[in-house]
Regions:
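Beta-sandwich interaction modules
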Residues: 43, 48-63, 71-154
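Structured alpha-helical subdomains that flank or immediately precede key functional sites
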Residues: 155-270, 274-278, 284-297, 315-324, ...
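Membrane-associated feature with strongest affinity for ZDHHC
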Residues: 482-528
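Bacterial N-terminal signal peptides
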Residues: 7-15
């Protein structure tokens, strides 16, 4: 099993909140922008629910805005977000506060602004306050008159620098909170964290009163959705009949991006659902045909041609089935034919669709009842990667669900600056399932193996949103079940043929029970709960190996393609030991003796006996060379 180890990607420096403010407040202060002529207005408005007000003159133009605000929180799941809206309808983030950013009961912010510190001469219309479980008092509004120096390239450069500084400061706040509260994830600066508010809102399909909890700053570790620390893991979680860890990325010992295709970027769009569906389909095609097909399908076609009413801005719940129906009934062409363009103003370009390359799914299954962990684990293990995501606290973001794990006492968290090991007292975490998602909204720059994947614990599985399984076979032009690869790569006698029933092109000697891990000769079949059958100890021979001494072996030996076992001494098979020579494998007895032999030859395998080598079969065992094997006895014998 893979040990639960996550690499936290930035150093966490413990600071008190007051100390933190002293260091990072300058990038949130309008007064820090030199050259501004400012105007301060007294407001003294109190808000305990969502509301808007209009403090601006009809002809007013501003280049910056900050607020003096007092926030009194009523619970830890509070949210405050204040937006400036201009007369064209554009929204700018003035401030946002949630527990990971500000965890004091009383928060006092003076001359505070975020995006609104640098505005390119806008006409302000209103200020909107979104509030949950808190009371907000806006005392003063400070605005800056237009500044002729902040235009063109200068404005863009200063805006990008401000985004960078603010993102670093907010990530540091979150990391201090995470360290104080023993959270298992790390915040940092990514392209998503530096997006403007409207873009970030669109990418995450977020409501104005949505609480990200810092998701937009996630760069590694296990993110939490909901109030995980409110109670221990349920009995259903801790007594699950399913295996503790399962991950489609590494099934059968394959490398990264073999079963799962590479990480894609949805840009500034809300195409997460389409990227999720395409990601599932590409991966299921690999898993169904049991090989890497290197498919790259068109999210653009699925978005604009499936009938979704406004794909760029977000998919309504009523439209959710439409792209799945399109995948089944029409199919999706390649990215090369219909490439992704990050634009809100587009339509279905049917002339781009190459009908000779449409990839289809057989059907899909929409999990519509209240999901529980065990049901999701069953679908994932037995059906492959799924479309799911995060649907909680005003966020609705689809991803590809590829695996899960269960947190256990003793699991190690490596943070670069220290190691945190899950302790016995971490009762609120032990037994909880974390889910592994392939994402399309985060631009990672760390080159860590987990880049592009998000690990999430949910308070309850209903927060995973709409859950879909795409059903095989995946229909690809020019491919049939005869193209499914049927192979034994570990030499245990079990064969792997991917997801689905045993294909007719498997050789007649292939057993009906599929190999659960074709990279491990010690593991046999996989049951519905994800547990592997344990086989007697064995060794896979993949390269040339020589047994030159007189010795015995208790191991089952699987000689696979590229493997050569040469026996030049006396080797005695004991216990459950036997030799299986697979397609492309070679067994050579070169002047040595193989005693008590139990040998299975597979068509395409080779046996060579030379220099008076001898094979003495075990009692009751007969040497059989099926049609298609090569047996070359230059000098020697088989008894």
């Amino acid at each position: 099993m893979r040990r639960l180890t996550f690499l936290f990607l930035i150093c966490i420096i413990p600071l008190l909140c007051s100390e933190l403010r002293a260091q990072d407040d300058s990038c949130f202060s309008l007064a820090n922008n030199k050259g501004y002529i400012t105007d301060k207005k007294s407001v003294n408005k109190t808000f305990s629910q969502n509301s808007s007000f209009y403090p601006f003159k009809s002809n007013e133009i501003i280049s910056g805005l900050s607020l003096d605000v007092d926030i009194t929180k009523e619970s830890s799941d509070y949210l405050v977000r204040i937006l400036l809206k201009d007369r064209d309808g554009a929204e700018y983030l003035v401030l946002e506060a949630y527990n990971e950013l500000f965890d004091e009961d009383k928060i006092i912010l003076s001359d505070y602004g975020e995006e609104t510190l640098l505005l390119n001469g806008i006409c302000p219309d209103s200020i909107s306050v979104f509030v949950r479980n808190a009371t907000v008092v806006i005392k003063n509004i400070t605005t800056a008159l237009p500044n002729s120096l902040q235009t063109g390239k200068t404005y863009i450069k200063e805006t990008e620098a401000l985004k960078e500084h603010q993102a670093k400061a907010k990530a540091q706040r979150i990391n201090n909170y995470n360290q104080l509260h023993k959270k298992l994830w790390t915040a940092g600066v990514s392209s998503l964290s530096k997006k403007n508010y409207e873009t970030k809102k669109r990418i995450l399909n977020m409501a104005n009163d949505g609480n990200t909890g810092g998701l937009d700053y996630y760069i590694g570790g296990i993110f939490e959705v909901g109030n995980i620390t409110s109670s221990k893991a349920s009995k259903n979680q801790t007594s699950s009949p399913y295996v503790d860890e399962f991950d489609w990325r590494y099934r059968h010992g394959k490398p990264d991006n073999y079963w799962l295709t590479s990480i894609k970027d949805q840009g500034d769009s809300n195409f997460c659902l389409f990227f999720s569906i395409v990601g599932c389909t590409e991966s299921l095609a690999n898993l169904y045909y049991n090989t890497n097909l290197n498919l790259d399908l068109s999210e653009m076609e699925l978005a604009w041609c499936s009938g979704v009413s406004s794909p760029y801005g977000g998919v309504s719940l009523g439209d959710y089935d439409l792209p799945f129906d399109y995948l089944v009934n029409h199919g999706v062409c390649s990215e090369n034919s219909y490439p992704f363009i990050d634009t809100a103003n587009d339509h279905c370009r049917s002339e781009n669709i190459n009908t000779n390359e449409l990839v289809k799914a057989s059907d899909y299954y929409h999990y519509q009842s209240n999901p529980d962990e065990n049901s999701i684990k069953y679908l994932l293990i037995n059906g492959g990667p799924m479309s799911a995501g995060i649907h909680a606290n005003g966020i609705w973001h689809a991803m590809v669900l590829v695996g899960y794990g269960v947190i256990k006492q003793g699991d190690a968290i490596n943070t670069l600056v220290n190691n945190y090991t899950i302790q016995e007292e971490d009762t609120l975490l032990i037994g909880r399932t974390y889910w592994i998602f392939k994402d399309s909204s985060f631009d990672y720059i760390t080159h860590n193996p987990t880049d592009g994947y998000v690990y999430v614990i949910f308070e309850n599985c209903s927060q995973m949103g709409e859950i879909y399984s795409i059903l095989t076979p995946i229909i690809i032009p020019g491919y049939t079940s005869a193209n499914i690869v049927c192979e034994d790569n570990d030499g245990d006698g079990y064969y792997n043929w991917g997801i689905g029933p045993k294909p007719s092109n498997c050789p007649s000697w292939v057993p009906d029970i599929e190999d659960g891990d074709d990279s491990d000769i010690n593991s046999g079949s996989l049951n519905m709960f994800g547990y592997l059958e344990e086989l007697p100890p064995g060794k896979t021979i993949k390269t040339p190996v020589v047994y030159a001494t007189n010795d015995s072996t208790p191991y089952r030996l699987g000689i696979v393609n590229g493997g050569v076992l040469t026996i030049s001494g006396t080797t005695t098979l004991t216990g459950n030991s036997k030799i299986r020579v697979c397609e492309g494998g070679i067994l050579i007895v070169d002047g040595g003796t193989l005693q008590n032999a139990d040998i299975t030859m597979v068509p395409g395998s080779t046996l060579i006996i030379r220099n008076n080598g001898v094979i003495n079969m075990a009692s009751g065992k007969e040497f059989i060379a099926p049609v298609g094997t090569i047996v070359n006895i230059e000098s020697g014998e088989i008894n």
